[in-house]
Amino acid sequence: MAIKHLAGLAIAAAFISTQAQAKTEVEWWHAMGGALGKKVNEIAADFNASQSEYEIKPVYKGSYAETMTSAIAAFRAKEQPAIVQVFEVGTATMMGADKAIYPVYQLMKDTKESFNPDDYLAAVTGYYTTNEGNMLSLPFNSSTPVLYYNKDMFKKAGVANPPKTWKEMEEVSRKLLASGAKCGFSTTWQSWTQIENFGARNNVPVANNNNGFAGLDTKFKFNDSAFVHHIEQMGKWSKEGIFKYGGRQSDGMPLFYTQECAMTM
């Protein structure tokens, strides 16, 4: 429930019943560290200052995976938080956890709160919406791939504008290599940027059954010719120095920070 990143992220509601009191504490487990963690604290502080009925208590629980597994363990121990942030990779897990979560669409219906899923971007809510159109969770900190490039290295290579297509990525990278760059580009979160988002951009599903939303008997379609061709191309570029693999998740970012690679996403 968006993850990626990271990580396409969302808030999966697992609201526990509490007795009425002067100020109800709402514990919110999240996976936002560093600057994003500070922002989460600001959001909570602003909300707390805006009214006197509820007190949001944000709690950092580590990585996306650690936060989700911690929430599952807490639920089994009957010590779950009121709200937990779960990345999109955990969507299927949350969809199958009927008793662990309170689906947002049902929560809003039961509490008679005004709620319109169309207020959110369909490309984002699609991650967390069933085939019947029911939104299971609220998008939060949803991610999208962004291309970063080093302007100084581009200027040295005589490149005026960043590439907009994979063909242009290859052409620009060759110019960068010719100007002395050690590699053209690297990427982070490869399965997300080079499979999932590549598929979305080219309207190629990563799985059958409506990308898994239509049933549990779902199979991946990584062997689709579009994916195979793209990954083969990445392998070719890697051998030529156009692309350099820097590791899983965000481990490839230092290749850009140190100016070894002129671009990253």
Regions found by a protein language model. Give the residues of each.
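Hinge/lid segment of periplasmic solute-binding proteins
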Residues: F87-T144, E170, E196-A200
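Gram-negative bacterial Sec-dependent N-terminal signal peptides
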Residues: M1-Q21
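Alpha-to-beta junction loops
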Residues: F75-V86, A100-Y102, A181-C183, T258-M265
